[in-house]
Amino acid sequence: MAISDQGQRTLSNTCFCRSAGATGVDSARRGFLTGAAALAGLSALGPTAGCASSATTPATLARTRIDVHHHFIPPFHVDAMMAPGRRTGARPPKWSPAMSLDDMDKSGIATAVLSIAQPGVLFGSDFAESRRLARELNDYGAKMVRDHPGRFGLFAVIAPPDTEGSLREIAYAFDVLKADGIGLLTSYGDKYLGDPSFAPVYEELNRRKAVVYVHPTTPDCCRGLVPGIPPGSIEYATDSTRTIAHIVFSGYAVRFPDIRWIFSHSGGTLPFLTGRFTRLAEEKKDPRLPDGPLPEFRKFHYELAQGNTPGQLDALLRMVSVSQVMYGTDYPFRDGAEVNAGIAAYRFSAADVRAIARGNALRLLPRLGPA
């Protein structure tokens, strides 16, 4: 997303930094920072980190960032997506491992955690195909991790409507491939992630204290509603909100507290709707949410791909602390330059930039390297 001139928030040559604390952004944190303390350590994060000099060139950009939203799209997955009769939308962009590495190097990304994007591996109810495709994709991603030490991690794909196949693939992904987590979509047909049938899958993920990354999809309910506007332009953000709310209001967030969730695109529209969900919980008087939904929303993690404009960041940081925010690019649909520019325009403090770019991801994914 383009950042407007107004969103740059640049006054003369003075660096205007923000720091988000435990309860988000407030006016006390919007003042000018004096001295050079806010710049400490930013040079290692490259030209678009916090208040780093715009004179720095990409060639000097140290590789430090961890990208938790980075897609891999091998040719056999494209073939499956584009098979006749499938409602999978436009053909995905061209991709190769070399293209990923090139953008990572240009953007200062040390490690990208690979995941697949919509439409995933489940087409209709053909579990045999989804199992085969998941295994092929997970093996492909694991080979990239092995072939490029330190550069990639892996969120392995499963299809939760297939309980037996999912449990088998979870075991294979963690025990054989040593995957870093599991990647899910926001919905599967008419099932969102709070669906009762998914409980056995979550029991196993909770037992393993798994990291679960969730990517939006275009839901079956809402295709072609607005002429001339691709459904993903609206529905990706909305489907993320639906599934996050479903996880919380189903009781799964409380029932499975050891699953570490990461949601895409700054949580979609969720940060703008927390008041509505709080009132809903008060009206329902749900014993599973004695303190309302907000404490559960605040336990989750949110990455910034296509969610890094000033308005989006303001809303997100009123909902959660910076400790729950992670760096993501959505490559190859977007690139690292976009999110780097968004983070720089917001003028985070140096400490917050370090946390978003690397530190917060390492808390969940320590295998990816030293702090």
Question: Which residues fall in each region the model found?
Answer:
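Mid-to-C-terminal alpha-helical segments outside catalytic/metal-binding sites
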Residues: 2-50, 57-64, 68, 74-111, ...
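Active-site gating loops and adjacent loop-to-helix segments of metal-dependent hydrolytic enzymes
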Residues: 10-17, 71-95, 124-126, 131, ...
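Histidine-centered divalent metal-coordination motifs
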Residues: 69-71, 215, 265
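Active-site environment of divalent metal-dependent phosphoester hydrolases
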Residues: 73-75, 120-122, 161-162, 190, ...
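Active-site gating/metal-coordination segments in enzymes
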Residues: 116-244
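Conserved N-terminal glycine/acidic-rich loop preference
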Residues: 211-214, 238-248, 269-287
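Active-site flanking residues adjacent to catalytic metal/cofactor-binding acidic residues
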Residues: 214, 264, 327-329
